[in-house]
Swiss-Prot record:
Domain of life of the native organism: Bacteria
Organism: Trichodesmium erythraeum (strain IMS101)
Function: Specifically methylates the adenine in position 37 of tRNA(1)(Val) (anticodon cmo5UAC).
GO biological process, one term: methylation
Annotated compartments: Cytoplasm
Disulfide bonds: none
Keywords, comma-separated and alphabetical: Cytoplasm, Methyltransferase, S-adenosyl-L-methionine, Transferase, tRNA processing
Name this protein carries in UniProt: tRNA1(Val) (adenine(37)-N6)-methyltransferase
Family: Belongs to the methyltransferase superfamily. tRNA (adenine-N(6)-)-methyltransferase family.
PANTHER family on file: TRNA1(VAL) (ADENINE(37)-N6)-METHYLTRANSFERASE (PTHR47739:SF1)
Length: 239
């Protein structure tokens, strides 16, 4: 999903100044997360603003305010421009902060926090700093994200994330130690015979029975499954 811009049904993402482009991970999370009952939403590491705009579209009939924070200055400027060109500029606010700084200054408590966080920990790092920030955990570790959730979630609020399998298991263990419990989980397989590559999770402060499902993206190369199409049809132009 490269290129300088990506068009969705109700908004366009320009991304020539963003380190991380529109991808399947962010699109999946934005389409899957439960927005019902949320009035205040926080998108941590918004990048292009994709997830914030997807949630704004999904909550168009509701009174929902969305804050989006992004540490990289160029990405935050472009995300703000993407928001300003959308129909939801009155409800989505983009701020150029690290989540560590935002925790210190934020007075709100959120009903929903979402993040498509970086997950490379011990891999070689790209030369460009912006790419490093976007892809590596140095600037948004699992501990940072969980600390933000513990401090900024309301008592009934939820945290929604997407991680590769190993990191997802580690994240869930750390979350439980801090009193955040997985109540909804989606295992994502690229194709039927390929193992799970991504896990989406919703966590809350209340321990509830786990709802677990599996989503397969493609039947074969370039042929999406009906389940995936159902999930993203409100966004992808093709459907």
């Amino acid at each position: 999903m490269g290129g300088n811009q990506f068009r969705f049904k109700q908004f366009t993402i320009r991304q020539d100044r963003c380190a991380m482009k529109v991808g399947t991970d962010g699109t999946l999370l934005g389409a899957w997360v439960d927005v019902s009952g949320a009035e205040k939403i926080l998108d941590i590491g918004t990048g292009t603003g994709l997830i914030a705009l997807m949630l704004a579209q999904r909550s168009s009939q509701l009174k929902v305010d969305i804050d989006a924070v992004e540490i990289d200055i160029n990405s935050s400027i472009q995300a703000r421009e993407n928001v300003e060109r959308s129909r939801w500029s009155d409800r989505v606010k983009v701020e150029n902060y690290s989540i560590q700084k935002y925790i210190d200054i934020c007075q709100k408590r959120y009903d929903l926090i979402v993040s498509n966080p970086p997950f490379f920990e011990n891999a070689s790092k790209p030369v460009k700093k912006a790419r490093t920030v976007a892809r590596h955990t140095d600037f948004l570790s699992q501990a940072d994200l969980l600390q933000a959730a513990v401090k900024l979630l309301s008592d009934t609020g939820k945290l929604a994330v997407i991680y590769p399998v190993e990191q997802a298991h580690n994240f869930q263990e750390k979350a439980e130690y801090l009193g955040l419990f997985c109540q909804r989980k989606l295992d994502v397989k690229p194709m039927p015979k390929i193992p799970t590559k991504r896990i989406l999770m919703e966590l809350s402060k209340k321990k509830l029975p786990l709802q677990k499902n599996t989503l397969t993206i493609e039947v074969k190369q370039y042929t999406y499954t009906p389940e995936f199409i159902t999930l993203i049809k409100d966004f992808y132009l093709k459907y």
